[in-house]
């Protein structure tokens, strides 16, 4: 959904897509919660080891965040990212490992409540954000709307949050956590003003 919204330049189309996507997400979360606890095994993604795919995605994301830190000249971002990168490399290549089957996603009562909160409350905030962003961009006198990017990031954030609360694999949890961190950074700096960049 995030990609669809990113490429949706039409405000009227976005006003249909966002509420529809929020409705589907919220209803799916409630149905998931009503069905109760579950376990989901994911061994492969497109024929590749799921753990390897997530590790590569995590590595690429950390390199991207490191690049942001370099571009901004932020020692804090670069230092924190390097620590995470060292941890990932140590976990994957240095620690002696042995194959233990791990259920990729596990839902218990608490995680299902969290999915419902993220999807319903996050969805309502997203719908409210549509009107807010219209007024905000009018206030900033923007000629070209940044709303496609904004709503794409919001949906990516909500998806990563749901992945985070359902994930049963430490490596995968780090990836979802880093996605939420990057999305937060991008949302805080969304206006691209000096103040927004400093706050991000």
Located regions from the model:
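Alpha-helical multi-pass transmembrane bundles of energy-transducing inner-membrane proteins
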Residues: 10-14, 149-200
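Transmembrane helix-loop-helix hairpins at membrane boundaries of multipass inner-membrane proteins
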Residues: 1-152
């Amino acid at each position: 959904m995030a990609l669809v919204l990113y490429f949706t330049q039409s405000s009227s189309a976005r006003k249909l897509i966002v509420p529809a996507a929020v409705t589907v997400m919220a209803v799916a979360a409630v149905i998931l919660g009503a069905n109760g606890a579950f376990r989901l095994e994911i061994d492969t993604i497109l024929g590749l080891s799921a753990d390897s795919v997530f590790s590569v995605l995590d590595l690429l994301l950390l390199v991207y965040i490191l690049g942001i830190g370099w571009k901004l000249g932020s020692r804090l971002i670069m230092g924190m990212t390097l620590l995470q990168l060292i941890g990932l490399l140590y976990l994957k290549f240095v620690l002696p490992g042995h194959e233990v089957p791990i259920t990729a996603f596990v839902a218990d009562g608490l995680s299902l409540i969290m999915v419902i909160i993220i999807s319903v409350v996050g969805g309502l905030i997203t719908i409210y954000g549509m009107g807010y962003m219209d007024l905000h961009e009018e206030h900033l006198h923007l000629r070209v709307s940044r709303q496609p990017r904004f709503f794409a990031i919001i949906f990516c954030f909500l998806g990563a949050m749901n992945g985070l609360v359902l994930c049963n694999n430490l490596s995968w949890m780090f990836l979802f956590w880093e996605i939420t961190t990057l999305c937060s950074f991008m949302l805080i700096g969304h206006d691209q003003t000096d103040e927004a960049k400093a706050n991000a």
